[in-house]
A protein has these predicted regions:
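Generic alpha-helical hydrophobic packing signal
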Residues: 2-5, 36
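A short, surface-exposed loop/turn module that caps and links secondary-structure elements
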Residues: 33-59
Length: 89
């Protein structure tokens, strides 16, 4: 099982999502549970981002993605962000 850790930005985004986007928040919770077991496969079309070395992404809804890194040696998944799309500026 992987340990899950969150950036400050991701933590703030998740709180916002919990209040204003209940369907997306529900999907996020399911994805986080999957990340604990298998961070490279599962729902949300997991993909390694081409232009961000070591960063993975999963689709939460049409607009939002969860971005994360995986450290196999520490058995840790670090969530970078949970709102927006990685191409958003």
């Amino acid at each position: 099982m992987y340990q899950i850790d969150f950036s400050d930005e991701a933590s703030e985004q998740i709180l916002l999502m919990r209040k204003s986007m209940p369907q997306t928040y529900k999907k996020l919770k399911a994805v986080i549970e999957e990340l604990r077991v298998h961070p490279y496969t599962g729902t949300g079309h997991p993909e390694q981002l081409r232009y961000m070395k070591g960063v993975w992404s999963r689709k939460l809804d049409k607009k939002n993605r969860i971005r994360y890194t995986v450290d196999g040696q520490k058995v840790l998944v670090f969530v970078i962000s949970a709102l927006g799309h990685y191409e958003d500026k």
